């Protein structure tokens, strides 16, 4: 069954050594799948320069509800 998760991601800018926090909404079957989905999204966004960061860290995955 699919579930809705909030995934908090910390973005790091290596040039200014600052960080910021974003929250992504993800539909997945479990926490591991949610983590994998966000990791793939972040890698692609960094590669295509869509994300305003040099690196990231997934810091929290929060289950919201079953769909």
Give, region by region, the residue ranges found by the protein language model.
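Short aromatic-glycine-(Arg/Gly/Cys) micro-motifs in beta-strand/loop hairpins
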Residues: 1-19
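Short, mixed-charge low-complexity intrinsically disordered segments
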Residues: 40-67
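A short, exposed loop/beta-hairpin motif centered on an aromatic-Gly-Thr core
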Residues: 18-31
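Compositionally biased, intrinsically disordered low-complexity regions
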Residues: 13-15, 32, 52, 67
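Short beta-strand element of the conserved SAM-dependent methyltransferase core
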Residues: 5-11, 26, 55, 60-64
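A short, structured loop/turn motif at beta-sheet edges
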Residues: 1-2, 28-34
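Sparse, context-dependent recognition of short Cys/His-centered cofactor- or disulfide-binding micro-motifs
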Residues: 11-13, 27, 41-46
């Amino acid at each position: 069954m699919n579930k809705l998760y909030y995934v908090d991601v910390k973005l790091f800018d290596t040039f200014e050594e600052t960080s910021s926090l974003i929250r992504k909404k993800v539909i997945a079957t479990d926490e591991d799948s949610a983590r994998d989905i966000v990791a793939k999204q972040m890698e692609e966004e960094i590669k295509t320069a869509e994300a305003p960061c040099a690196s990231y860290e997934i810091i929290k995955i929060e289950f919201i509800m079953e769909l």
